[in-house]
Every structure is written in C-alpha cells, then in structure tokens.
Amino acid sequence: MNERLHYARIGTIGAEIRACRVSPVDLVDLCLSRIDALNPQLNAFITVLHDRARAAARRAADDIRSGRWRGALHGVPVAVKDFYDTAGVRTTAGFERFKARVPGKDADVVAALDRAGAILLGKTNMHQLGMGTTGLESGFGAVRNPWNDAFIPGGSSSGSAAAVAAGLCYATIDTDAIGSCRLPAACCGVVGFKASYGAISTRGILDGEPADEAILWLAHPGITTRGVADAATVFAAVANEHGTLTAATDDAASGRRIRIGIAEPPTSSGDVSAAFGAAIEKVRELGHEVVSAAAPFDVPRFGDLRTIAADRQTVAERRFKEVDVVVLPTLTTTVPRVEASANPQSLSPANTLFANYFGLPAISVPCGFTGGSGTAQAGGSPSSDGGLPIGLQLMGRRFDEATLLRIADAYERDTEWPTQPPLPIPSR
C-alpha cells in the first residue's frame, strides 16, 4: 500500500486527498519516513523540514475537510531545489560557504506552491552553484543515481531527479540554464520540463547574490515529476500571466494532425540512436505528420544580451515555421559512470542548451533503458543486468506549452516506461 502511494501520480493522489480517502498528514509522514530511510544512501536532500511539513499537512487536512480546497496540489508533498530562496529556511545552492545563508523571503515560485497548498518537504541537493552537469560536486556530498550508484545522477538538479525517481516526493521545482533539469531527469528515468523563458518567475534564485546577467537570460525554472500530466499540473500552479496551457495554434487546439520534426544530432552514441529510433516509430504511431527537421544545435556566443533577444525572435519566426514540435535525444550518450566524470561538465548539454538560448519550452521523458552491455532495450522494463534510463526530448514553440505537453503525454501513455528504480540502489 505504501509503495503504491509513493509512486502514485499527482492526479491520482490529489483526487484521493480531495475526497478525504488519503490524509495529507499520513502522506507527509510516509514521505518523511521514506526520506529518512533512503536519503543517507541517495543524498538527495540537503535540508528536510520535518516539523514544518507536518504542520502544513495538518492545516491542509483541516482546510480540505472544511471545503476550502485550493486545487490539484493541495496537500501534495513536494520539494524545491536548494537554489530557490525559502523564508526562514537555509538556501545553500549546494555551496558549503552558504550553509548558514537564511533568506527572509520566499522565491516567487515557492510562494506560488504555498498558495496552491503544496506541502514543502525540504530542499534538494544540487551540483554546487549550478556549475556542473554531473551532480557529483556539492558542499553537502554527491547525489547518487537511484538506478545504479556507479553512474552519475546528472546535474545540476541532481537531488531533485533522484528524489522523484526514488518516490521521496511527487514533484520538485528546479532550475534549467543549459539542461540542468532535463539532463538529470534523463539520467534518473523521470520527466524534466522547462517552460518558455518568462512563463515562470525566476525572482528569488539566490536573491542578493552576484550573478552573471547573461546566465540569467538562460536560466529557466524547471519541473521534475514522474509523469507528463503531473508536470502540466505543477506548471499550471506556478506559471505567471505569460504561461498558459492554451494551445498556440488552431491545429493544436482542435486536435488535428500537427507536424513533428525529427532532429537527431550526429553526435548521438549508438545506444542512444537505437532507443531514439524506436521512440520515433512510436511517435509516428500517434498519427501526426513526421518530417525531418534541423534543430539549432550550434548556439552563438551569448555575451551580448541584444543578440539573445534577436535570436529568440528569429527562431520563433523561422525554425518553427514548418513544424510544431521538434524531437531529439536528451543526452548525446548513455549515462556516464562516476569514475569517468571528473570534469564537472562531463555530461554534455549539446542537445539541451539551445532550448535555453532560444527561450523555448522543452521536456525530457523516459524512452527506454540500456542493458548491462549498453544495448538499448526495446521492452517495457530495464534489463536485469543493470539497465540505465534513456531520455527523449521534445521542444516546442515559445509559449506553446500546451502542444508540447500534449504530444509528450500521448507518447508517455503509449509507452509507459517504468519510473521505479530497483531500490536499494544496485552498484556494479
């Protein structure tokens, strides 16, 4: 019973909470117990808010019983990457020198979660200061991949992907500047979603600390969940006035066939290419028009902010003139081993960075597993000899999250790759 609840989707658990068949108090206790049991191995959380979460759960239970239901996230346990300021709770960015940094105000997205009634369990670990893609460098220790700790979890939102994959919480709010949410989602076999630039507020990411203005133009809030519909639910709760789940085109809104561009970069490894090819066959079966497409893999130097703004307008006018969604692998290789990842940028963001540069919505969904020999598995489960997840990335027009999420959800429903790792973590 407990395992079923830990891996339930937000839509399911939210309905159970609203109907008072599951209490937020019991659910939070289950999650905290699981964190206490598994976090010593995973190191997914830097800070766990036992007392605060239980108090919030009691308030949520009282409100829901009294008919004051706030929506689909009310009473749902979530976590936030330790990049976002949380009033009265330390925010470290995985940087040991920030271990006593306690903000006085919530980041906008944290405040939005609170308004939605979500229960904050704690702050997730990350590659320190967001400056790496492996998840191995943090002032609070490396995060471990819940599928196999001999392999990296990806970064910089490493703790979030590990926490969601291990059933410690139902969703996390993250950041994504070069793929920081999508890369670890692909490594850990979960969903990583980055909305369009400007659709979710970034205010309150280490507020008051020095930051590179060009990097801020690339930084997007991200959402990690176990399913596409869950990502859409969280997005609806935290998006600002620019973020919408209304389709941007008449074709997408009506449900008629849309054009999906297939863009596999030449740098993909053989294992990734095999899984990608199988995924594309599934995409064809969805009934939409599939064509070849050139994705903007070559990102210009981004020192001039005026250049970024102009390029974003160009891609909106030209790159998506012929297609509605572009599909490509999330990673260029299979998940790297820890011993091969001494460089903090060992996991290449070559397939993810351009979505940040151009401000486009993008999502990574599971599309298969490698076998212990590195062979992509076409079946519905990881191989018995240590399969690692492989991610499929979909990218859409700016501010057309609705079409992107609809296509990703249809693919997910047609494949249903497992998102429950074989805990305790195997190591080989």
How would you name each of these model-derived features?
Residues 12-15, 19, 33, 125, ...:
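Serine-dependent amide/ester hydrolase catalytic core
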Residues 13-19, 97-101, 219-226, 394-395:
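Short, well-ordered beta-strand elements within core beta-sheets of diverse protein domains
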Residues 43, 170, 324-326:
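Conserved acidic residues
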Residues 53-61, 117-118, 127:
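Long amphipathic alpha-helix in the N-terminal Rossmann-like dinucleotide-binding domain
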